[in-house]
From Swiss-Prot:
Catalyzes the deformylation of 4-deoxy-4-formamido-L-arabinose-phosphoundecaprenol to 4-amino-4-deoxy-L-arabinose-phosphoundecaprenol. The modified arabinose is attached to lipid A and is required for resistance to polymyxin and cationic antimicrobial peptides. Belongs to the polysaccharide deacetylase family. ArnD deformylase subfamily. Its EC number is 3.5.1.n3. GO terms for biological process: 4-amino-4-deoxy-alpha-L-arabinopyranosyl undecaprenyl phosphate biosynthetic process; lipid A biosynthetic process; lipopolysaccharide biosynthetic process; response to antibiotic. It comes from Salmonella choleraesuis (strain SC-B67). Pfam families: Polysacc_deac_1 (PF01522). The lineage of its organism: Bacteria, Pseudomonadati, Pseudomonadota, Gammaproteobacteria, Enterobacterales. The keyword Membrane does not apply. One of its GO terms (cellular component) is membrane. This is Probable 4-deoxy-4-formamido-L-arabinose-phosphoundecaprenol deformylase ArnD.
Length: 299
């Protein structure tokens, strides 16, 4: 049996309103639990449109047929009008999710984090994280114990900024296996659970066709030599590709794969995890930098 952590990112108002309820129903039908990470502030995702001038981002949008995949309400959100507050508008849905699944913070403002966190000061990072955690805790009525940086935009500064929030774990980077981030010699931070597998929008296109994606990703899960963690998005697998995701759950079960919340991947003694650090890097299919796992020594 292969255990795969299932992470569900919720980036937008529509993803929360439409995608999450469908995913909750789908997961319930198949007896699967996952980790949901919510954006709870303004939905300004449409402001990413200016990135179309960047060839890699434009190619990604064309390759994934973004208008069909996400819908124009997502692609234009927060452009000609102020972005609506996701958490306030969907508190009931978020509370229901937290009743049945591990629930953590993705971002206060997903667009702002993805665009500006790379040059924010530690103080600004802490303020933004605190704003998101406070809002999410007010909605779900219990402490937030985990987080996942929007767009995997994280580095050593983000790791340090999150230390004051006493989280059980963070999932801020791409990598191969769980690790303890080294803050300074002799001092480690909150365990990191990296995403190890590609997302739909990173690979779909000439190399991998939509109809063969499930077969392809299951093969990658079975071949993963680390701690497999897979990310889906409420805006994709919860809406236009919900049937594809349901088919994935069936095929994965038949292949001996069990999905679980990320928290279940943590060992009883996190001190046994290897040391590592998060550095800025790049991966195929994703425009811009993102946090990547790198080995570190204790010295």
């Amino acid at each position: 049996m292969t255990k795969v952590g299932l992470r569900i990112d919720v980036d937008t108002l529509r993803g929360t309103r439409e995608g999450v309820p469908r995913l909750l129903a789908t997961l319930h039908r198949h007896g699967v639990q996952a980790s949901f990470f919510f954006s709870v502030g303004p939905d300004n995702m449409g402001r990413h449109l200016w990135r179309l001038i960047r060839p890699r981002f434009l190619w990604k949008m064309l390759r994934s047929n973004a208008a069909s995949l996400y819908g124009w309400d997502i692609l234009l959100a927060g452009t000609a009008w102020p972005g609506k507050n996701i958490g306030n508008a969907n508190a009931g849905i978020i509370r229901e999710t937290a009743t049945y699944h591990e629930t953590g913070l993705h971002a206060w403002d997903h667009h702002a984090w993805q665009t500006h966190s790379g040059h924010w000061s530690i103080r600004q990072l802490k303020e933004d994280i605190a704003r998101g955690i406070t809002a999410l805790e007010a909605i779900i009525g219990k402490p937030v114990t985990c987080s996942a940086a929007a767009g995997w935009r994280a580095d050593g500064r983000v790791v340090r900024a999150k230390e004051s929030f006493n989280l059980r774990y963070n999932s801020d980077c791409r990598g191969t296996t769980l690790f303890r981030p080294l803050l300074m010699p002799g001092q480690t931070g909150t365990p990191q659970i990296p995403v190890t597998l590609p997302t739909w929008d990173e690979v779909i296109g000439p190399a991998v066709q939509a109809q063969s994606f499930n077969t392809w990703i299951i093969s990658r899960m079975l071949q993963d030599k680390g701690t497999p963690v897979y990310t889906i998005h409420a805006e994709v697998e919860g809406i236009v590709h919900q049937p594809l995701f349901e088919d994935l759950l069936v095929r994965a079960r038949d292949a001996g794969i069990t999905f679980c919340p990320l928290g279940e991947l943590l060992p009883a003694s996190p001190e046994s995890l290897p040391l590592g650090q998060i550095v800025r890097g790049h991966i195929p299919g994703r425009e811009g930098w993102l946090g990547c796992q790198q080995a570190a020594s204790a010295s």
